[in-house]
Amino acid sequence: MRGLFSHPRFWLFAPFLGLLALTILAFGLWSYASERIRHDLAALGLTWQSVEPNGFPARLTLDVTAPRLVQENLTWSNPNLTATLMPFNLGLEDSHGVVDFLGAHEIKLPSGTFTVSHSGNLMSLLLAHDGLLRSSFDMRQPVLKGVLVRQKWRPEIHLEAQELGLHIRRSEKQTRTPDPMDVAVQLKNLRVMQPKSLGKEAFRRLDILASVPKLWLQNKLQAGDVLRLDRVTLERKALTLVARGTLKLDARGYVQGALDLNVVNLTALLDALQEARLISPRDRAKWAFLGGLGAALGGDTQDRLSVPLHFKNGRTHLGPLDLGPAPSWR
């Protein structure tokens, strides 16, 4: 053995042998990480037809065919996706992940079955060793089609939009704490093709800034959960509406709470409610009278009005008007 180490040719090839050994070790760790990721995804309920890892050594890319996720109240599938984690560092440092959804999303919920097609859908994630730091989900030209099975007449739903963005973040790197997650939703130029009673042009812009329980990201809702809406901005034709408030999931399955609505253009709001068949002509006249009364007695005007929206005892109330059942979360 001493003769081997003293041989000149050994030291000539020693760097290459060392590099080969390190490459084999790195590939082994890369393969282990690939298997570990697949194991963790399977533990969450994700299945697939096939998974092909590639990208060694700089990154870890998984080409997934026919991924499918099955949970208690959710079934999701997609023809193909590509997930890339870079740099490849075994979770020792923060890593950036990118998921490219190559096909339409098929979603089954208790309320109905839906298909979401698009012209491009990327999700980016910043991952720490203890979980998700932040995530962005961007979709171009989304089209939602489906059927609401809980309704007796099984109405068809057909929505189209220009862009959809969903952004999630947490301020600290402690995933085991019950701290809520900050969520931002951006939707541009939504059009309601079905049902036609809602009007083709739904709104030009919808921005939501909210704080949600962390378990909501895992589709785990429970009674007592609190949703804090820091700001909701909606623009539709001549109507601009800004809302703030707090909502709570009631044990009976309804949403409870209150929102403060700041309305620009009361007439446009009444037009929207009447088009959606939520108010009658008589209700419209009552609201027009109250708007004029508020302008005369308070600081509001008919162009700018503050209106409370309450969800209480399973009903939805806009000021004095009963708009029907409160939203159900179950």
Spans of features found by a protein language model:
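N-terminal type II signal-anchor transmembrane helix
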Residues: 2-41
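Extended terminal
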Residues: 2-15, 52, 219-226, 232-234, ...
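N-terminal beta-strand/beta-hairpin edge segment
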Residues: 46-174, 232
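Flexible, membrane-facing loop/turn or short amphipathic-helix motifs
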Residues: 66-76, 103-116, 143-159, 170, ...
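Low-complexity, intrinsically disordered segments exposed to solvent
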Residues: 80-84, 91, 130, 207-214, ...
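Extended amphipathic, helix-rich lipid-handling scaffolds
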Residues: 102, 119-147, 164-169, 185, ...
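Gly/Pro-enriched, hydrophobic low-complexity segments
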Residues: 176-184, 191
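Short helix-loop boundary/capping segments
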Residues: 197-218, 237, 244-247, 251-253
